[in-house]
Amino acid sequence: MHLSADISSALQQIEAVKKGIDESDDPKLQMQTAESLSTILGILQDPVFRTIVHVQDSLSELNAQLAQHPSMLPNDFDIDVAGNLVLSLNGGEVMYDFDEQRSSSHSHSAPGSPDKSGGVGEEPRPQSQNSKGAGVADLYATDYAQIQAIELVNDGTGLGFGIIGARNSGVIVKTILPGGVADKDGRLRSGDHILQIGDVNLHEMVSEQVAAVLRQSGTHVRLVVARPVEQSVPTPQYALEPGTAVVPTRVLVDPAELERYLISTGYPEIFGESSTASTPQTTTEDDRFVYRGETSMLIDPNIDLEELLALPETEKLQVELKKDANGLGITIAGYVCEKEELSGIFVKSVSPGSAADLSGRIRVNDRIIEVDGQSLQGYSNHQAVELLKKSGQVVNLRLERYLRGPKFEQLQQAIAANDKLPSSAPGTPSRAPMPTPVATTSSATTTPSRSITRELEEEALPAPEAFMTTPPSVTTMTTTTLSSFGAGKQLVAVRDSLDGSTKIIPTEVVPLADKTEAKNSGVITRHKYYTDPELSDDAETEIIRKWQKIVGSDVEVIVAQIKKFAVGGLGISLEGTVDVEGGREVRPHHYIRSILPDGPVGVNGVLRSGDELLEVNGERLLGMNHLEVVAILKELPLDVRMVCGRNRNSSLLPFSDDTLKKLSNNFENLLPATDRLVKAKSDGSLATAGSVADGDSVAAAAASFSKLKSRSLEPLTGLAMWSSQPQIIELVKGDRGLGFSILDYQDPLDPNDTLIVIRSLVPGGVAQLDGRLIPGDRLLFVNSINLENASLDQAVQALKGASKGVVRIGVAKPLPMTDNSLKACSNASTTSEETLDAQPSPPALPTVAPPAMPPSASMGAEPDLIPDWRN
């Protein structure tokens, strides 16, 4: 029972109690209860309170609808100013949920007159078996009604009309949306009584049942409506539209009697065969997506209506497949709906005779939810392919199958629309004409409606034998055929950027060179960073000439054509640097810090540590953000063309552990510690202090490094282990902070933990003037806050949260590392940094050499983000 009905019942009970007390002879009781009863009655009768209760009832009804139809979206419902629940069904039909209690309260209204709640007023009548049906006849003020069958085709925007429903009066068309499907068709009118949808008669249906019927109606919706005839007795000259008939109003009470009357008068097609559709039906779609006239919207009349309401829209199933020589034998595609409610990885086709086909449990349009217990939520198509590729011989798939409802319709229309896109059949030989590249920028040209899903990203996976000859081939709108997920098979990814827009990214197609690939598709889709596998002399000369103009004659331009291994990256670690102007980081540069000898770059042998990355596969890296550079390097295809700059000045030694160790040993004692271990942030040239040491070697070293721009030189130490004895340093914190910056560092003894390390000192700052704190010190605590294994954010908050005045800082001093310890800690990786003061940077203090850095992480598989050691 609705809350409003409960309140009405309570109101009646309280009024009865009040009446009984008023009629009693107990003045004391009357005096004690009069005020309370009046207050309660005033609240229960208050119009605002009743409206709130009505809204609450609408929300309860909405919850019930959501439980039955989980695919409902925010745009599918609303609550009007009267508090009524408004449901937008099937993309556009609107149903106003009618409250019978409100209907009875307006029973004094004239028949057919709309009340303020949007319902239809009715006169009180004796309850009988046919009382509900009699209400239908009472809607008409004439003795005759016109019956018409109308078929509308939902174009994806809805049918464009609104309805109101009451239990006794049936379903009435309330509004016609201008420009909608019904408005363009012109046959449906406001005030029409809807008698039937498809083969389902709406006699005595409640709103929930009508909602279920509308949700099952599909794309082609056939309505049988009745409207009053203005003339009391129709004459032969009465103009009837095609597919219409005039019947006595009394026969509308009984659907069976109405049908018999129509048959006897020569109009059997109104309740039988479909009328002419208002929109031409297309027949070019794949058979499984063809809407078969009215049969696509019919519901088995033998199904109980209560059972119909409980039918689920989806079902989930678990399937175990064993790979054969051809893999799984399914093709997948990624879809994203505009409403963002229908998205994921779907089965697009099943290869005959494959493991998936023989299982008999996988169907086209099934959505893959999990692979071996791993959820695919948020996975791109490429990531899903990778996961399936890495699965074992036996694969457990969890699938979701759409059986009915809006998502089912949207998925059918989406795949049908995609099937219309130009593509090359699998059997097309390589000499077939090339299709025009797809470059669609609006949903109107890619899908038949605004709510249709779009295929945003697909991947290509060749058949096993394709690896022995030419590059894999796929269709223009490439799909992922999971038929070669065998051991040792290589996945060549066709990765286009996936954004949230409505466009399909244009692809470039090239012909196959070998007719033996005819059983695959006739075209391939190039990788977005594709480059020619061979470097011609002319191409190399042109690249060098272009970059020589940019970097100048002091830099040698090196071009390397590299072939990546089937698994892994380039085998380099990367270092990013910037210049600092006015406290802002400008002019980013990217250097090769180290090269794995047996990696692709190391085997190629052209590039060296210290070379600056300028371009890769035609993509300019100079001036690009460091994170973007790392992302590009990780996405490169097998063929890589790297353009680097190498300083012709021989005094600039390449970055290597041996070189940095020698530099550290040679120059470590040239300057006092307070001058050596300072981060320089100046834009000027670096100069050495002439008063520190004499000799030709010092002068030569100073001259060689005086030409370097400031790169925020870092501590001259390669330390990665610290003393077990903490040292307490007290610094006086002022308005400009403590004068040092920190970074988090992977614990060499436990890769899961991080350490906080002093990164650099601000020249002239508190820490630098004190002289006891040096870069490389491990931060243990600040005042009473333990930071031994704290995160960077926690350390920053502890330092910034320290009050002005004396701050007690506990540090562990670094210990010198042996060669063995260096190797043991080669996996340590610096990840991020924070500067803990806003003090303007003064001119750089004298310093002489590039830093010796802690060894970077992963010297092989992928480029690493090494923080700005030479800033």
UniProtKB/Swiss-Prot annotation:
It is found in: Membrane. PROSITE patterns: L27 (PS51022), PDZ (PS50106). Expressed in primary and some secondary epithelial cells such as ectodermal cells, salivary glands, foregut, hindgut and invaginating tracheal cells. Also expressed in specific cells of the peripheral nervous system. Expressed in the germline. Residues 149-229, 318-403, 559-648, 728-814 form the PDZ domain. Residues 822-833 have a biased composition (Polar residues). Residues 437-451 have a biased composition (Low complexity). One of its GO terms (biological process) is pupal development. Residues 840-854 have a biased composition (Pro residues). The modification Phosphoserine is found at residue 682. GO terms for molecular function: myosin II light chain binding; myosin phosphatase regulator activity; protein kinase C binding. Keywords: Developmental protein, Membrane, Phosphoprotein, Repeat. It holds the Pfam family PDZ. GO terms for cellular component: adherens junction; apical cortex; apical plasma membrane; apicolateral plasma membrane; cytoplasm; nuclear envelope; plasma membrane; septate junction. Residues 100-134, 420-453, 822-871 are annotated as: Disordered. Its main location: membrane. Residues 3-67 form the L27 domain. Belongs to the Patj family. Involved in cell polarity establishment. Probably participates in the assembly, positioning and maintenance of adherens junctions via its interaction with the SAC complex. Component of the SAC complex, a complex composed of crb, Patj and sdt. Interacts directly with nrx via its third and fourth PDZ domains. Interacts directly with par-6, possibly mediating a link between the SAC complex and the par-6 complex, which is composed of par-6, baz and aPKC. This is Patj homolog. It comes from Drosophila melanogaster (Fruit fly).
